[in-house]
């Protein structure tokens, strides 16, 4: 009995997966992007850009590398192994379970209810 239930459950999951993946409309990447971003990406039929520099974005000086330490000040994130970690912002709220987890728990609970 349990084997047929697992087969039915597997078929239900496969059906849901196929229906969800095929129901999403297929929109090209360029249609999804905003007009400000689309010109920055190459289109599928374009030739390679020339090296005249007209298509490049001018760069600005980068900020200093945080990995290089000159030793003039202690690292504020470093703490000894026996000390408590530094107090920082509160932890992010816990994430909600995904729809798949909720669907699985609903199917299992309803199947166990029907088995009674």
Swiss-Prot record:
<keyword id="KW-0449">Lipoprotein</keyword>
<feature type="compositionally biased region" description="Low complexity">
    <location>
        <begin position="69"/>
        <end position="82"/>
    </location>
</feature>
<comment type="similarity">
    <text>Belongs to the classical AGP family.</text>
</comment>
<protein>
    <recommendedName>
        <fullName>Classical arabinogalactan protein 25</fullName>
    </recommendedName>
</protein>
<keyword id="KW-0325">Glycoprotein</keyword>
<feature type="compositionally biased region" description="Pro residues">
    <location>
        <begin position="83"/>
        <end position="95"/>
    </location>
</feature>
<feature type="compositionally biased region" description="Low complexity">
    <location>
        <begin position="50"/>
        <end position="59"/>
    </location>
</feature>
<dbReference type="GO" id="GO:0005886">
    <property type="term" value="C:plasma membrane"/>
</dbReference>
<comment type="function">
    <text>Proteoglycan that seems to be implicated in diverse developmental roles such as differentiation, cell-cell recognition, embryogenesis and programmed cell death.</text>
</comment>
<feature type="region of interest" description="Disordered">
    <location>
        <begin position="40"/>
        <end position="95"/>
    </location>
</feature>
<dbReference type="GO" id="GO:0098552">
    <property type="term" value="C:side of membrane"/>
</dbReference>
<keyword id="KW-0336">GPI-anchor</keyword>
<keyword id="KW-0654">Proteoglycan</keyword>
<feature type="signal peptide">
    <location>
        <begin position="1"/>
        <end position="28"/>
    </location>
</feature>
<feature type="propeptide" description="Removed in mature form">
    <location>
        <begin position="90"/>
        <end position="116"/>
    </location>
</feature>
<dbReference type="InterPro" id="IPR039346">
    <property type="entry name" value="AGP25/26"/>
</dbReference>
<feature type="lipid moiety-binding region" description="GPI-anchor amidated serine">
    <location>
        <position position="89"/>
    </location>
</feature>
<keyword id="KW-0732">Signal</keyword>
<keyword id="KW-0472">Membrane</keyword>
<keyword id="KW-1003">Cell membrane</keyword>
